[in-house]
């Protein structure tokens, strides 16, 4: 291994005592290869098993906690006890080489495009009329529905424990439902979850995390990992949905009620790990990851994500993070981290051919609705993205 990459292979201990032998994380990647009813398939299991040695901490693609929160047509569910057996197989595959397996819990809110197809509307904090992907309404969640949603996260955590996962991650990133309650762009409510105060906007985040923590305290084995994924600011030009200062205040409140083991920073765009603060204030222009990590230093490990598709970018990102979440490179080269460790980084292959799909355990029908997100991030070469785009034509034949 080249000396400059050695920090990537230093061990890390999470707050709960879990030991990781390097700084790589297999970050969430939805393959869209489950059943329409949200059950894990053998394709999902085989894909996970092929990457079981990729990183010591592995996080699943999004598992939806409520039918109205389903983003992807062939994503997997954690909404019912019948999901547990398939999730158990998935967890076992992820853990086959000693990795820690974490189930990501999500509700896509107004972006729950498959729920929109099924029900004709979606839910959010406040009423909206949207035009994409077709004209539709966003209905505001009632107080009772919010309570049911909080309970759904708790039940999903219970199922993750029963399925044998080593942890759960609650995602509030990239305009998923929890984040939209925190943002003044989307939260126009006037009740106790409304936009009148920062604390009110934070209430759903805090309530969900507290409910998850309660289940962990009561039912999880020692060393169970509790992660949180979030976007530290939301801006549109000069308009602010929430600032990084407000996010840091949220994290103070979060750490008072939840024993988190990491914060994963996520957002949209290319090279997210290089994002700089856009909200006015003392942090303006500094790297987002640096600001958040400095604030949380000695309190909570911070994970960088987004765009680290070379060893040089990985080590650059680690300068302002405790570990790094890699997604698309592990799709096409499960040995990405191993090759860096062995000093063989020139043999990393991000450009793949149809003949490679079988050895990579990539399902023949996969990545439907995911390729446009890959296009946006551009972490993979165009040739690989074009190949994945061709797989989306196989759904009618196979599914």
Swiss-Prot record:
Keywords: FAD, Flavoprotein, NAD, Oxidoreductase. Gene3D superfamilies: Aldolase class I. Directly interacts with lipoylated GcvH-L (SpyM50867). Its EC number is 1.-.-.-. Signal peptide: none annotated. The keyword Membrane does not apply. Belongs to the NADH:flavin oxidoreductase/NADH oxidase family. PANTHER family: BINDING OXIDOREDUCTASE, PUTATIVE (AFU_ORTHOLOGUE AFUA_2G08260)-RELATED. This is Uncharacterized oxidoreductase SpyM50865. Transmembrane segments: none annotated. Disulfide bonds: none annotated. GO terms for molecular function: FMN binding; oxidoreductase activity.
């Amino acid at each position: 291994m080249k000396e400059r990459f050695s920090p990537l292979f230093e061990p890390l201990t999470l707050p709960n005592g879990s030991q990781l032998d390097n700084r790589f994380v297999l970050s969430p990647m939805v393959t869209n290869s489950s059943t329409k009813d949200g059950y894990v398939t053998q394709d999902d299991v085989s894909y996970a098993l092929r990457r079981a040695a990729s990183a010591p901490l592995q996080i699943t693609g999004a598992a939806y906690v409520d039918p109205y929160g389903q983003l992807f047509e062939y994503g997997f569910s954690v909404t019912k006890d019948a999901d547990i057996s398939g999730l158990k197989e998935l967890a076992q595959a992820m853990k086959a080489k000693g990795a820690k397996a974490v189930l990501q819990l999500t509700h896509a809110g107004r972006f729950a495009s498959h729920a929109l197809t099924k029900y004709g509307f979606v839910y959010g904090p406040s009423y909206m009329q949207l035009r994409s992907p077709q004209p539709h309404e966003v209905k505001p969640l009632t107080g009772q529905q919010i309570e049911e949603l909080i309970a759904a996260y708790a039940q999903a955590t219970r199922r993750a424990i029963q399925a044998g996962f080593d942890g759960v991650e609650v995602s509030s990133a990239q305009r998923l439902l929890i984040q939209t309650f925190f943002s003044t762009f989307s939260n126009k409510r006037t009740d106790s979850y409304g936009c009148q105060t920062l604390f009110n906007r934070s209430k759903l985040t805090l309530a969900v995390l507290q409910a998850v923590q309660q289940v962990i305290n009561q039912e999880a084995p020692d060393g169970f990992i509790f992660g949180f994924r979030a976007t530290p600011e939301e801006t549109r030009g000069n308009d602010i949905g929430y600032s990084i200062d407000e996010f840091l205040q949220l994290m103070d409140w979060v750490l008072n009620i939840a024993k988190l083991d990491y914060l994963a920073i996520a957002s949209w765009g290319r090279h997210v790990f290089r994002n700089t603060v856009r909200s006015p204030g003392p942090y303006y222009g500094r790297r987002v990851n640096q600001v958040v990590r400095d604030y949380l230093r000695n309190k909570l490990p911070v994970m960088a994500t987004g765009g680290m598709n070379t060893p040089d970018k990985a080590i650059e990102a680690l300068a302002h993070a405790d570990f790094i979440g890699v997604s698309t490179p592990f799709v096409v080269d499960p040995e990405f981290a191993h090759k860096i460790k062995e000093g063989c980084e020139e043999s990393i292959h991000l450009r793949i051919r149809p003949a490679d799909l079988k050895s990579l355990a990539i399902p023949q029908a996969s990545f439907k609705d995911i390729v446009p997100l890959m296009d946006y991030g551009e972490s993979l070469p165009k040739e690989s993205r074009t190949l994945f785009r061709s797989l989306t034509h196989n759904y009618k034949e196979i599914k």
